[in-house]
């Protein structure tokens, strides 16, 4: 509210790891009363086969290892370390835990259980969701459908669970190949369009690109305002249903 926003209409939004962070908030009883919509782009707390959360014991083990690398024994000592040292030791920790050493922790309070269990129990925030992927997220190898990839599978799985709770979910796929590149619709490529910042991109954007960006900005802002992306749009974006399923394509 101090910045002119509406505290009674809060949308959390994230992309990739940011989407995972946003998603986990929708499972916390401390956060859900303050959240009214969620936008999750190319990421989900359940997007990989291994659980993306730690038990308290696992988190303590990682913390102990980090203390060891830093040569300290308490959080107070960590806080006194130079930022450069923290970055160096964090990079070193990543080599020991390549599948992300820093994760949400199931502590029974902030996060009462794992997201997969809470999803099955209907324990997600009962709000509208907008979520999707890019066509070439994570560069799925040729011959394998990107629809088999973790991001897409997680989005559809979560959408199905939400529908059982009568929660609207709007799924999308960003299929637009960016100009000036043969990398297709790669991971993060949609961000120039959803934020309407094409003029800050070095690529030779065309009128077609600007029109697509305008369409996406309209949908995203409409969803933020009212939990429905269909205000002032040319084509209706239908919510997901288990029976037929609808995924809007941005191409």
Predicted regions and their residues:
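Surface-exposed patches in mature extracellular/periplasmic domains of secreted proteins
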Residues: 8-10, 72-81, 171-173, 231-239
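A general structural signal marking secondary-structure boundaries and capping sites
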Residues: 29, 70, 82, 227-228
């Amino acid at each position: 509210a101090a910045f002119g926003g509406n505290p009674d209409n809060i949308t959390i939004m994230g992309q990739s790891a940011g989407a995972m962070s946003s998603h986990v908030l929708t499972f916390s009883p401390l956060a859900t009363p303050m959240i009214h919509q969620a936008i999750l782009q190319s990421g989900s707390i359940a997007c990989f086969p291994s659980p993306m959360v730690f038990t308290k014991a696992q988190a303590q083990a990682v913390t102990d290892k980090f203390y060891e690398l830093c040569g300290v024994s308490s959080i107070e000592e960590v806080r006194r370390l130079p930022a450069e040292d923290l970055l160096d030791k964090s990079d070193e920790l990543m080599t020991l835990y390549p599948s992300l050493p820093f994760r949400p922790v199931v502590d029974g309070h902030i996060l009462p259980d794992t997201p997969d269990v809470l999803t099955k129990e209907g324990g997600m925030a009962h709000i509208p969701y907008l979520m999707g992927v890019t066509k070439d997220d994570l560069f799925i190898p040729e011959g394998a459908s990107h629809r088999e990839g973790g991001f897409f599978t997680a989005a559809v799985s979560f959408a199905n669970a939400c529908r059982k709770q009568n929660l609207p979910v709007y799924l999308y796929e960003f299929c637009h190949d960016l100009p000036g590149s043969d990398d297709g619709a790669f991971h993060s490529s949609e961000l120039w369009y959803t934020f309407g910042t094409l003029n800050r991109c070095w690529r030779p954007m065309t009128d077609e690109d600007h029109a697509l960006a305008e369409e996406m900005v309209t949908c995203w802002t409409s969803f933020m305002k009212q939990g429905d992306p269909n205000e002032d749009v040319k084509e209706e974006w239908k919510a997901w249903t288990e029976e037929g399923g609808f995924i809007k394509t941005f191409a």
